Amino acid sequence: MAARRGKSTRTASEVGAAGPRASARSVNGAPTVPEAARPGARRNGPSRASGCRREKSGPDPREKPQVRTRTARAEDQAEGPSAPSERVEPPSAQGASLLRAGSCRAREARSARELRPQAGATELAAPARMEAPPGAWKLQTVLEKVRLSRHEISEAAEVVNWVVEHLLRRLQGGESEFKGVALLRTGSYYERVKISAPNEFDVMFKLEVPRIQLEEYCNSGAHYFVKFKRNPGGNPLEQFLEKEILSASKMLSKFRKIIKEEIKNIEGVTVERKRRGSPAVTLLISKPKEISVDIILALESKSSWPASTQKGLPISQWLGAKVKNNLKRQPFYLVPKHAKEGSGFQEETWRLSFSHIEKDILKNHGQSKTCCEIDGVKCCRKECLKLMKYLLEQLKKKFGNRRELAKFCSYHVKTAFFHVCTQDPHDNQWHLKNLECCFDNCVAYFLQCLKTEQLANYFIPGVNLFSRDLIDKPSKEFLSKQIEYERNNGFPVFW
């Protein structure tokens, strides 16, 4: 999705007091990548098994002495069944892996002998190889720590399901302008890469809008004005037109108003105060535990994807050209995330969203159709993404409200991860036994993105998520310094 959320829809996605609760009901009572975007890139090299691409990071003053449709997946046996697109199904809820200095190279040599690359296969450019990371890592222990509890998942899913379906019935009923909305579940929980606690959910209420015309805003590639090719009388969205332009701010305001009115009738749920520039209506559920649910209105278009996406989604060597073509035949979405204009926002603009495609990619992430199936080889792609998300999350906790970290979100981490998957497209580069090296490669790529100030949107390569217009250089330098310190000292922030 787009830089979405601090959390990006919250994320890039980024508490109003509820009114009198007449006849209140309890919740619980309810039953490729452009060259500039690839730091340190080389041209297509030979396929290889995973190996650390490590260069010793510069010393830090605080540095310590170094001492496609699939059958059931193996990961689902450990974490429970996948959440379906139309309903949250509570998923089911070892051995620590110890990394010794120099072990990555030994494993790399073994992998090169045991796993020959496919004839004629090539990989996209990657950063230079690096020495094995220092210190003892117990990454499997970290993954166990951030694994979601089955009991917590069941409780959270039941409550979120009930609230969301209640609101959906309200919007679909009567003569609402949003009568045609349908549910689209997105975000890390439904991608099965949520970490720590099931306390955040993203839900799209999609509304199909046929025969629309997009007008790109200031060559941004990501933000658009929306017009109707024809506007026959009786169009329920006509009231949201502003000089023939479908106003994102007007539509979001009405959507928010309907939700706020309905939430007054549900005990234990409130609507968070509106955040400037956010496309989401955020619900706060207080029981059984505090849960936030971002509800995002999304316009669904079944037209061809905009021209700005033509060179995006570089998965041909990873998931295959056929998969790419099939994904690009899916609809695209526009969310009411306004473009920045000076010190304010252009409130009539909509932003492209591909969160549904991101979910599909993560669900079917292997080059081989048997990757992570019960009888297939288990890869460590999702484990690396979880660890990257946890690293950023823990640094934010460590430094509290430091201004330098405020604009970084999990969407930046996920975008960098997708680019690493493009660089290393083969399953033999992501063997679970090589988790430490694969994670280090992801960290190395993210560090280079910070240092070069280049991170291309995975779907809209002309959009640089690390441009100085979006994130200032001192903030990128601060995060880079902290990640280098963690990397050189065995990631103490994990413990």
UniProtKB/Swiss-Prot annotation:
- Residues annotated as carrying 5-glutamyl polyglutamate in the record are 261
| Site residues, Cleavage | 294-295
Work out whether the entry's keyword set contains Lipid metabolism: no
Q: Which residues carry this modification: Phosphotyrosine?
A: 190
Q: Name one GO cellular component term.
A: site of double-strand break
Membrane topology, from the record: Peripheral membrane protein
Q: How is the cofactor bound?
A: Binds 1 Mg(2+) per subunit. Is also active with Mn(2+). Mn(2+)-activated enzyme forms an inverted pppGp(2'-5')A intermediate, suggesting a non-canonical but accelerated 2',3'-cGAMP cyclization without substrate flip-over. Mn(2+) ions are coordinated by triphosphate moiety of the inverted substrate, independent of the catalytic triad residues.
Give the region (Required for association with the cell membrane) as residue ranges.
57-68
Location of the protein in the cell: Nucleus; Chromosome; Cell membrane; Cytoplasm, Cytosol
Region annotation (Interaction with collided ribosomes) maps to: 316-357
Catalytic class of the enzyme: transferase
Instruction: Identify the stretch(es) annotated as Required for activation upon DNA viral infection.
Output: 103-134
| Disordered: region residues | 1-128
Span list, region DNA-binding: 1-134, 147-190, 359-382
> Record keywords: Mitochondrion included?
no
EC number(s): the record gives 2.7.7.86
Q: Where does ATP bind?
A: 188, 358, 389, 410-414
Q: Where does GTP bind?
A: 186, 294, 351-358
Residue numbers marked as site, Arginine-anchor: 230
- Modifications after synthesis and translation: The N-terminal disordered part (1-134) is phosphorylated by AURKB during the G2-M transition, blocking CGAS liquid phase separation and preventing activation. Phosphorylation at Tyr-190 by BLK promotes cytosolic retention. Localizes into the nucleus following dephosphorylation at Tyr-190. Phosphorylation at Ser-410 activates the nucleotidyltransferase activity. Dephosphorylation at Ser-410 by PPP6C impairs its ability to bind GTP, thereby inactivating it. Phosphorylation at Ser-188 by PRKDC inhibits its cyclic GMP-AMP synthase activity by impairing homodimerization and activation. Ubiquitinated at Lys-389 via 'Lys-48'-linked polyubiquitin chains, leading to its SQSTM1-mediated autophagic degradation. Interaction with TRIM14 promotes recruitment of USP14, leading to deubiquitinate Lys-389 and stabilize CGAS. Ubiquitinated at Lys-359 by RNF185 via 'Lys-27'-linked polyubiquitination, promoting CGAS cyclic GMP-AMP synthase activity. Monoubiquitination at Lys-322 by TRIM56 promotes oligomerization and subsequent activation. Monoubiquitination by TRIM41 promotes CGAS activation. Ubiquitination at Lys-260 via 'Lys-48'-linked polyubiquitination promotes its degradation.
**UniProt entry keywords in alphabetical sequence:** Acetylation, ADP-ribosylation, Antiviral defense, ATP-binding, Cell membrane, Chromosome, Cytoplasm, DNA damage, DNA repair, DNA-binding, GTP-binding, Immunity, Innate immunity, Isopeptide bond, Lipid-binding, Lipoprotein, Magnesium, Membrane, Metal-binding, Methylation, Nucleotide-binding, Nucleotidyltransferase, Nucleus, Palmitate, Phosphoprotein, Transferase, Ubl conjugation, Zinc
Q: Which residues bind Zn(2+)?
A: 365, 371-372, 379
Identify the residue span(s) of motif Nuclear export signal.
Answer: 143-148
Which family does this protein fall into?
Belongs to the mab-21 family.
| The protein's assembly and partners | Monomer in the absence of DNA. Homodimer in presence of dsDNA: forms a 2:2 dimer with two enzymes binding to two DNA molecules. Interacts with nucleosomes; interaction is mainly mediated via histones H2A and H2B and inactivates the nucleotidyltransferase activity by blocking DNA-binding and subsequent activation. Interacts with PQBP1 (via WW domain). Interacts with TRIM14; this interaction recruits USP14, leading to deubiquitinate and stabilize CGAS and promote type I interferon production. Interacts with ZCCHC3; promoting sensing of dsDNA by CGAS.
Q: What is this protein called?
A: Cyclic GMP-AMP synthase
Organism of origin: Sus scrofa
The encoding gene: CGAS
